[in-house]
């Protein structure tokens, strides 16, 4: 099952040239870039592992792509995403986020429904490999 999180998630995987173009777009607007990775793509898992610190002072897309490549080498079977942060309002707000690496075999999600008091329905999601 293809995980659909962030911008461009319903499109085919971006090439490195397309990723570079998106990074240049972000840097051109003064947004900082951060690289994150995870092996658990559950929709409620919003806290991915950071790959280094966000690159607040970087103005060159090549530096971001070097970090992406290093993260890909260290975590080839994990999800890797780029986050762009906009601080123009005095807050570091995620303005853009998209996946740049996926494992060869993506896990699927299984939903379990249980009935409780008053016929209330409760749902549980599990990641299956």
Swiss-Prot record:
The keyword Ribonucleoprotein does not apply. Keywords: Calvin cycle, Carbon dioxide fixation, Plasmid. InterPro entries: RuBisCO_ssu, RuBisCO_ssu_dom, RuBisCO_ssu_sf. One of its GO terms (molecular function) is ribulose-bisphosphate carboxylase activity. Residues 104-129 are annotated as: Disordered. The keyword Electron transport does not apply. Pfam families: RuBisCO_small. It comes from the Bacteria. One of its GO terms (biological process) is reductive pentose-phosphate cycle. Residues 104-120 have a biased composition (Basic and acidic residues). Belongs to the RuBisCO small chain family. HAMAP family: RuBisCO_S_bact. RuBisCO catalyzes two reactions: the carboxylation of D-ribulose 1,5-bisphosphate, the primary event in carbon dioxide fixation, as well as the oxidative fragmentation of the pentose substrate. Both reactions occur simultaneously and in competition at the same active site. Although the small subunit is not catalytic it is essential for maximal activity. The basic functional RuBisCO is composed of a large chain homodimer in a 'head-to-tail' conformation. In form I RuBisCO this homodimer is arranged in a barrel-like tetramer with the small subunits forming a tetrameric 'cap' on each end of the 'barrel'. Heterohexadecamer of 8 large and 8 small subunits. This is Ribulose bisphosphate carboxylase small subunit. It comes from Sinorhizobium medicae (strain WSM419).
């Amino acid at each position: 099952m293809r995980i659909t999180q962030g911008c461009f998630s319903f499109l085919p995987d971006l090439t490195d040239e397309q990723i570079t173009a998106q990074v240049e777009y972000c840097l051109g607007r003064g947004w900082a870039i951060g690289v994150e990775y995870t092996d658990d793509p559950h929709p409620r898992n919003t806290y991915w592992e950071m790959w280094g610190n966000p690159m607040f002072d970087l103005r060159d897309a090549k530096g971001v792509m070097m970090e992406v490549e290093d993260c890909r080498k260290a975590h080839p079977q994990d999800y890797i995403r780029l986050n762009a942060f906009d601080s123009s309002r005095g807050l570091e707000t995620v303005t853009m986020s998209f996946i740049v690496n996926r494992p060869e075999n993506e896990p699927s999600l299984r939903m379990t429904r249980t009935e409780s008091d008053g016929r209330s329905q409760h749902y549980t999601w599990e990641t299956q490999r």
